[in-house]
From Swiss-Prot:
Keyword annotations of the record: ATP-binding, Cell membrane, Disulfide bond, EGF-like domain, Glycoprotein, Kinase, Lectin, Membrane, Nucleotide-binding, Receptor, Serine/threonine-protein kinase, Signal, Transferase, Transmembrane, Transmembrane helix
Name recorded for this polypeptide: G-type lectin S-receptor-like serine/threonine-protein kinase At1g61460
Transmembrane region(s): 393-413
Domain of life, per lineage: Eukaryota
InterPro entries: Bulb-type_lectin_dom, Bulb-type_lectin_dom_sf, Kinase-like_dom_sf, Pan_app, Prot_kinase_dom, Protein_kinase_ATP_BS, S-locus_recpt_kinase_C, S_locus_glycoprot_dom
Active site (UniProt): 579 (proton acceptor)
Enzyme Commission number: 2.7.11.1
Domain PAN: 299-381
Organism field: Arabidopsis thaliana
Residue ranges occupied by any Protein kinase domain in the UniProt entry: 454-721
């Protein structure tokens, strides 16, 4: 799912609601509600009354937000049967039923039979719930929250009772001016874990993907529109702000790529190991028939043979439909459950949910550019591309032999040039085990056992200098193993940096290295395993971002600052990280931030203030000031869309700071938990960190003081980023980022 922020008048901008009214205290047998009267909640947020569209004679009984123009209706009683008589009124019967009389035309709507009561009244609660209450016991006999329309308010809920089959769903209006039941229904599924599903008639229209039980969406208003869009919005000032809309993209429509198809940026593709079912139709853009497996699986339960199937991980996935929940305590257990079940086609271990497996065709799968989950799909081992026919192997022997002879000569010359250059340009230390003070040297066979011989099912991510694997030692301790790619021309220097630096650095906000392995050409780093992956997987994921509210984000900002302050001032070595960004901030099981990936770090003496190096590296500044703004806004630094304009996040932050003090920069998903003074302070600090003159930027000691006290801060000047962004885009790129040098993309530490 994708979150889209923009100001909106929402739904009823062009529709005029007509009503002239005065308030009454409540509804009882002696005091009905007539046209021209309203019933308000005690907190003044909601109002019940009669309304019509564009001077029409058709009147509806509804609930709306009081005092907000244009009026936004959240519940309608008589959706299918408007009243036309000017004497229409809402009364309460002796058996506690609400009755809407259409003058001499009789009853237009009824709440239905309720429990026996000797006296009752109707009230509008502070949550927007119309309730019928027993006068003697005080119990609720009927409530509108049990009969939802097209809108869900914060304290109402979608529901599916497995025992009775009873459902509470949202049903769309026929049009913006006709509240009768429309074509779309929003419901939750009976699956475990559940997911939201929009139906158009009997066919799925949009699906959210599985929800974690811990996720709590405290949002003011959720609507299923007459066009089938799910919209989540909040009122801010005089406007409605649309926090989320779905479907918003062609990939959001259910099953657009068919079985075993995967939608990537509006284009359908087949999973690895699959091909289009009908190639000619696929080429014409008719993708609904999907894909089929290229190589049939030959599964043997409990098989450990090399010719058995293997699991191929696919990252950034919206999990497909038709999953089943399996009781597994961790990703390894999930892998084993699927491995030993021949009908299991894929598995995914999702934080906050657990283990999901698929025994049916993959349907409605989407791959995002960031975020999402890792889906490991079962493929025949031949899909690895490692098994060649004997004829091909035989025909290649002569050519290969000749290649090796010529290659050996070229390799020898290349090694001489590398060593010659390295002696002048590389760091003044050799890659030897004894250099790793304080770290434990692991045996290669120990790491191979822990990572299942570096199996693909254990692979967490792929970076510029190699791959990262999850492992489990014999004592049960989980580890992350960074395996240097032998084809990397720069990787050894970065590898040596990480060993020498991290082995001597100890701080709760730095990732801890457990040891290394140096055997032959193999170079491995062994880290502590981070259960919650990296910070970017939360910030830029429309579902996970809701799990980190403002207090947690502020704690993360302070934790990063503490780690950087330690590197700059308090550690035995003075270290500049040089590649700090949210993807290099890992989160432990308690969501504590830990700085990782020291491949580009540089040591300097206590008297040195310049980092002299020819290598172009990552982000500018001490704490990567953009990180503060990304954590606050939940948006990536490179481009930030606001309305019809596209600008850098820093440019938008500066404009927001000048106009409103920066509060509208805050990620709207955490607005309910924010502390405005802290937010404004963090934005001001972020702008100070990107000042053009170094003297205007705070050092790490000043940064820590700014984040932990309430002392007055200097006023920031307009950043150079803002001045030059439009005038010279190539120049601004040099200023803003050189993140092409990112050294690892780790999805699951």
């Amino acid at each position: 799912m994708r979150i889209t922020f923009f100001a909106s008048l929402l739904l009823f901008t062009n529709t005029i609601f007509i009503s002239f009214s005065f308030a009454i205290a409540g509804i009882n047998k002696e005091s009905p509600l007539s046209i021209g009267q309203t019933l308000s909640s005690s907190n003044g947020v909601y109002e019940l009354g009669f309304f019509s569209f564009n001077n029409s004679e058709n009147h509806y009984l509804g609930i709306w937000f009081k005092g907000i123009i244009p009026r936004v209706v959240v519940w309608v009683a008589n959706r299918e049967n408007p009243v036309t008589d000017s004497t229409a009124n809402l009364a309460i019967s002796s058996n506690a039923s609400l009755l809407l009389y259409n003058g001499k035309h009789g009853v237009a709507w009824s709440s239905g039979e309720t429990l026996a009561s000797n006296g009752s009244r109707a009230e509008l609660s502070d949550t927007g719930n119309l309730i019928v209450i027993d006068n003697f016991s005080g119990r609720t006999l009927w409530q509108s929250f049990d009969h939802l329309g097209d809108t869900m308010l914060p304290f109402s809920a979608l529901m599916y009772n497995l025992a009775t089959g009873e459902k509470q769903v949202l049903t769309s209006w026929k049009s913006y001016t006709n509240p009768a039941v429309g074509d779309f229904v929003l419901q939750i599924t009976t699956q475990v874990p559940t997911q939201a599903l929009t139906m158009r008639g009997s066919k799925p229209y949009w699906r959210s993907g599985p929800w974690a039980k811990t996720r709590n969406f405290k949002l003011p208003r959720i609507v299923i529109t007459s066009k089938g869009s799910l919209e989540i919005s909040r009122h801010s000032g005089t406007d409605w702000v649309l926090n989320f809309v779905a479907p918003a993209h062609s990939c959001d429509y259910y099953g657009v790529c068919g079985p075993f198809g995967i939608c990537v940026k509006s284009v359908c593709k087949c999973f690895k190991g699959f091909i289009p079912k009908y190639i000619e139709e696929w080429k014409r853009g008719n993708w609904t028939d999907g894909c089929v497996r290229r190589t049939k699986l030959h599964c043997q339960e409990n098989s450990t043979k090399k010719d058995a199937n293997f699991f191929h991980p696919v990252a950034n996935i919206k999990p497909p439909d038709f999953y089943e929940f399996a009781s597994a305590v961790d990703a390894e257990g999930c892998y084993k459950i699927c491995l030993h079940n021949c009908s299991c086609l894929a598995f995914s271990y999702i934080h906050g949910i657990g283990c999901l497996i698929w025994n049916q065709d993959f349907m409605d799968t989407v791959q995002f550019s960031a975020g999402g989950e890792i889906l490991s799909i079962r493929l025949a081992r031949s899909e690895l591309g490692g098994n060649k026919r004997k004829k091909t192997i035989t025909a290649s022997i002569v050519s290969l032999s000749l290649f090796l002879i010529l290659g050996s000569t070229a390799f020898g010359f290349w090694r001489y040039r590398v060593k010659h250059n390295a002696s002048q340009d590389a760091p003044k230390y050799d890659l030897e085990p004894q250099d790793v003070s304080g770290s434990y040297l692991f045996e290669m066979n120990t790491i191979q056992t822990a990572t299942n011989n570096f199996s693909l099912s254990n692979k967490l991510g792929q970076g510029g200098f190699g791959s990262v694997y999850k492992g489990k030692l014999q004592d049960g301790k989980e580890i992350a193993v960074k395996r240097l790619s032998s084809s990397s021309g720069q990787g050894k220097e970065e590898f040596m940096n990480e060993i020498v630096l991290i082995s001597k650095l100890q701080h709760k906000n730095l990732v801890r290295i457990l040891g290394c392995c140096i055997e032959g050409e193999e170079r491995l780093l062994i880290y502590e395993f981070m259960l919650n992956k990296s910070l970017d997987t939360f910030l830029f994921d429309s579902r996970k971002r809701l799990e980190i509210d403002w207090p947690k984000r502020f704690d993360i900002i302070q934790g990063i600052a503490r780690g950087i302050h330690y590197l700059h001032r308090d550690s035995c070595l003075k270290v500049i990280h040089r590649d700090l960004k949210v993807s290099n901030i890992l989160l432990d099981e308690k969501m504590n931030p830990k700085i990782s990936d020291f491949g580009l770090a540089r040591m300097y003496q206590g008297t040195e203030y310049q980092d002299n190096t020819r290598r172009v590296v990552g982000t500018l500044g001490y704490m990567s000031p953009e990180d503060i703004l990304e954590i606050i806004s939940g948006e990536k630094i490179s481009r930030f869309s606001y309305g019809k304009e596209e600008k850098t996040l820093i440019a938008y932050a500066w404009e927001s700071w000048c106009e409103t003090g920066g509060v509208d920069l805050l990620d709207k998903d955490v607005a309910d938990s924010c502390r405005p003074l802290e937010v404004e302070r963090c934005i001001q600090i972020g702008l100070l960190c990107v000042q053009h003159q170094p003297a205007d930027r705070p050092n790490t000691l000043e940064l820590m003081s700014m984040l932990t006290t309430t002392s007055d801060l200097p006023s920031p000047k307009q950043p150079t980023f803002v001045v030059h962004w439009r005038d010279d885009e190539s120049s601004s790129k040099d200023l803003i980022t050189v993140n092409e040098m990112t050294k690892s993309v780790i999805l699951g530490r």
